[in-house]
Amino acid sequence: MSSSQDKANLPANNSRARAKKLVLELQDEICAGLETIDGEGKFLEESWERPEGGGGRSRVLKDGQIFEQGGVNFSEVHGNELPPSIISQRPEAKGHSWFATGTSMVLHPKSPYIPTVHLNYRYFEAGPVWWFGGGADLTPFYPYLSDTRHFHSCHKNACDTIDKDLHKVFKPWCDEYFFLKHRNETRGVGGIFYDYQDGSGLLYKGQNANGKASKIAKELGEYSLNWENLFSLAKACGQAFLPSYEPIIKKRKNQSFSTKERDFQLYRRGRYAEFNLVWDRGTIFGLQTNGRTESILMSLPPLARWEYGYKPEENSREALLTDLFTKPQDWFTDKSLEKRCLTHQALD
């Protein structure tokens, strides 16, 4: 992609204000919906300011009926010195003042049968450079195929409102991004992920030139999406979250669980912490730009555990997670998944 963009691909005149308004509204809508779903827990809000410019508001819910801990953050930060993580990706932004705004969410439910879930939608500008990024992904501990398919279906439908090719790239990109290289497994069952979307070039702008997402993007060819298309994409995907997650909670919240299942949940939460601290670019960006540490690390689970050399019992429900649900799958069309899940009571 060239470092200059034609006039047709410039952001809207009021791009920063509109992007900020969008992510603020998403934060409000999601928090209100989650409080209703939980029934007991309430979000406590803390506003913060960044000395170099900007600030945000962090909302955290603790010890609810459903959620052990959950956070939904908003930030709007700006400055003159770009962090190395941005310059390495887009060197043409160097020397320009920059602006970034976004909302991010991580929910850690009490029940091992309700998946952890993450969401993030963001916008960035620096001189001639601008882009949207975002996505949502699901991390179950005792997964069900129907829950996984529902989550993916809702986000595919949101992408399809803009262009039916988007999900073809954003789904495998999510599998690629939320991957623990040191464990050789995905963080969960994925969802969608996209970054550096400025409406030009190939849809895939990640780092794995030989991966599935890159291959599909090359087959589709260069895309011409404008600022409004990508703004609408962020809105549609953000609004798809509650319908994608609430039905899963309703189906699983009354399932009883044992100490064994709770211990396995905490063990797998350790993997979640490993990814966020080692691989997540959002965490790295926040720490490099002197963001609010408490907000940046809000994504970490309140409790987690590690166990040396743990191996699940063969053919167990726990083994199914690592054998099937922490590997990229074609959730919609692979009929063999149903047979494998049925024998482990993971199909309903």
UniProtKB/Swiss-Prot annotation:
The record marks H182 as: Important for dimerization. InterPro entries: Coprogen_oxidase_aer, Coprogen_oxidase_aer_sf, Coprogen_oxidase_CS. It catalyses: coproporphyrinogen III + O2 + 2 H(+) = protoporphyrinogen IX + 2 CO2 + 2 H2O. Pfam families: Coprogen_oxidas (PF01218). The active site is at H118 (proton donor). The keyword Cytoplasm applies. Its EC number is 1.3.3.3. Its cofactor is a divalent metal cation. A divalent metal cation binds at H108, H118, H152, H182. Its main location: cytoplasm. The keyword Zinc does not apply. One of its GO terms (biological process) is protoporphyrinogen IX biosynthetic process. It comes from the Bacteria. Pathway: Porphyrin-containing compound metabolism; protoporphyrin-IX biosynthesis; protoporphyrinogen-IX from coproporphyrinogen-III (O2 route): step 1/1. GO terms for molecular function: coproporphyrinogen oxidase activity; metal ion binding; protein homodimerization activity. Keywords: Chlorophyll biosynthesis, Cytoplasm, Heme biosynthesis, Metal-binding, Oxidoreductase, Porphyrin biosynthesis. It is found in: Cytoplasm. Residues 272-307 are annotated as: Important for dimerization. Substrate binds at S104, N120, Y121, R122. One of its GO terms (cellular component) is cytoplasm. Belongs to the aerobic coproporphyrinogen-III oxidase family. Involved in the heme and chlorophyll biosynthesis. Catalyzes the aerobic oxidative decarboxylation of propionate groups of rings A and B of coproporphyrinogen-III to yield the vinyl groups in protoporphyrinogen-IX. Homodimer. This is Oxygen-dependent coproporphyrinogen-III oxidase.
